[in-house]
Each structure stands twice: as C-alpha cells, then as structure tokens.
Amino acid sequence: MRVALRAAVVAIPVFLGACAVPDGGLFRAARFRDLHIYQGYAEKLLDGSLPYRDVFVEYPPGAFAVFLPPTAFGAGHYNAAFKTLMALCGVATIVLVALVLAELGASRRRLYAAVGLLALSPLALGPISLNTYDAWPALLTVLALWLFLRERDVLGFGVLGLAISAKVYPLVLVPLACVFVWRRAGPRRVGVGLAALVLVAAVVVAPFAAYAPHGVFESFRSQAERGLQVESLGASFLLLLDRLGLYDAQVVRTTGVAGRNLTGGAADSVAAVSLVLEALAVATVWILYARVRDPRARLPLAFAAAVAGFIAFTKVFSPQYLAWLVPLVVLVGGTAGIAAVSLTAAALVLAQVWFFHYGALFRLEWPVWLLLVRDLLLVALYAVLVGALSRWKIRIPSRSKTSRHSGLRRSQESWTAVGKGASRSA
C-alpha cells in the first residue's frame, strides 16, 4: 500500500503538468467540445429552468454531479473550475490505479510504469482531457473495480450504479462484476449487489424522472436512436468507399443530440450491423471471463476488454470516449499490456491530428484516411485484450480424453500392483 501511494504521489505532479500542456488545458482560457453546453445546463437549472422538462438534456442525470459544482465560482470562472474538477478526478484515478495494482500484487516497476503512463495521458488525449466530463465516469469505474478486488461487493455495485447514471457505458461491466462476485461469494451476494446498483441509479434519476418522466425518457431514447456517427468504425468504411468513388456519403448535422451522422439506407444498415457487432464483442468478453482460472487477477483485463469492445464497434463514437479506456488499459500487464498501451496511445495521438480540422473531416477530405486507421487501431486493441483473456480460460477436457486418461491411469495402477505382488512373492 505504501509503495502504491508513493508512486501516486510521484505521478500526480507529472499529471497536473501534463494537463496544462494541451490547448484548452489546465490554466488555459480556451475551451473545446461540450464544456459550454455543460455550463448552459447548469446555469439554466439555477435560473429555474428544470432539466429534461424545460430544457432538453442529452446527458444522463448523473452528469449534473459535475456540471453544477463549478457554478459556485461564478459564470466567469466556470471554465477554470470545471477543468480543475476534471483534473481532480484524474488525480483520484491515479491513486485508485495504484491501489488496484497493489491489490493484485504488482511489482514496483509495473506500478510506477502504470501510474506514469496514466500521468502522461493528457498529452495524448489533448484538449478533450479536461473539456469533457468523461473523467468522472472513468473514475467511478476504477473505484468500483478497486472495491470489488477489496471484496466490498455491495459498495462496488453501488458505485457502478452511480457510474451508469452518469454515462451508460459502465452497463457492460455489470455482468463481469456479477461473475466475479458469484464465483467468490455466491448468488445471494450478487442479488444484494444488483439491488444496491439499482437503488443508487434510481436515487440519482428519480428526482428528475419525478417531474419530467417524458423528458428523461426522451433523453435516453434520443441517444439510443442516434444514427451512424461520422467517426464510428462503420462510418469510416463508408467514407473510404466515398473517397474511392464507390459510394456517395452524405453528412448531416443532427439536432437535439449534437453530432454529425451519415444518412441514407446504407448508413442505416451499417448502423444496425454495428449494434450487432458491438453486442457480440461485449458478450464474447463476458463468456471468456466466466471461464478464466483466476477471476480476481483477470478482472481488470476483462473490464478493459469490455469497454474496448463497446467503443470499437459502436455506431456513435466521440474522441472523448477514449478517456474511459486509458485508466483500464494501463492495468493490463505483460506483453498484452505493452501492446494495449501502444495501440491506445497511437489511437489517441492520431485523433489529435484532425482535432482542429473537423471541418475537413465533415467535408470528407484527407482526415478520412486517418479516421479509418484510428478505428482499426481500436479494433486491434480489442483483439489484443480478448486474446489475452482467452489464454486464461479454464480448459475443460473432452469426455473422450477424460476416459482415455482414466483408462491409462487404471492400467498403470494394475501394472504397479502386479510388480509389487511379484516382488513380495519372490
């Protein structure tokens, strides 16, 4: 534990320094992505306009836990206060990553390497590192992971419920948590944990749903029914065909939920296929994890693989989603961990090349090629993590092999008995 905390103390100043480097970083006035939207939601709430009833909100209710606190510093300081809050989430995540590795008995070298890489991640994430609220659910997922490893199962499920209320993606981690707790503590503990998850999520959502049930439903529905977002894997293949003159891509700006989607029958079909692939990718991780020899040691790997599958094949992709992956990927050890970190870093850096040239991407120009490479890197990341997970599954011998081994064992025992009898009669 002391080694873990020392590693975190060393990494935190590095992290804060890295947060100040990108455009829109810590101590910088510029802001990007959706930060102005967060401020608008928070200020309208304080002015008496209720979210989901008077104002359409595209984010889950749990997001207001980080939208509202920066308003305490005034409208003119919301930008700096929000970035500071996200930096604090990052600091807490570094501490938790160190504690997770300490729980797993990681070596000092691996521990320092993991927190060091996490500390440098704002350089690769760029402006999105502090200008979106994704550091909040990312922190909660690592906290839940640590609690599960500490056998604080009910608290772990409760934190997952809070994470789901802030961003829906942690739902893919729930079956993994159920498998882990079931194999260690039995189904009753799983039931209690799931009850805690539902209770926490309900406590967060209920106040909003009480006065605006239709608005909350519309917020979730609008997200679920989004089309093929331009940065998704499926869209990148259609954009490639467009560049080759084999397809006429049409990019449209969506209302309500801000974004740029591809429109048309082909795009709709690819979006449907993406949902199927995403479900299969995540379910594959669940099945493989259910068969691992050591569920405790492999839980961080399974968390990383499930989130990677969710992101790689989704029909809606935004670059800030990669912030969910970083603290989980650095927990993966061995050769797979090195490969996973390298692929994640490459995907992050590549996305920064066109970050300030999104207009060119929406006009279907040169960033299309880089987009395809980035998306394929994420597919490769998923493959690496699933490959590592599959190598740790329980090997169940077939009945024929079992019978053959049993027969050989009986034959060996018979010959041993004969040999001993001959020796005694002599």
Give residue ranges: language-model regions.
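Juxtamembrane membrane-water interface segments that cap and precede transmembrane helices
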Residues: 65-75, 246-267
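Extracytosolic (periplasmic/ER-lumenal) interhelical loops and adjacent juxtamembrane/interface segments
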Residues: 39, 43-44, 52, 56, ...
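Extended ligand-binding clefts on enzyme/binding-domain cores
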Residues: 227-235, 268
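N-terminal leader/capping segments at the start of a protein or of a new domain
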Residues: 222-226
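Multi-pass membrane glycosyltransferase architecture that uses lipid-linked
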Residues: 1-221, 268-426
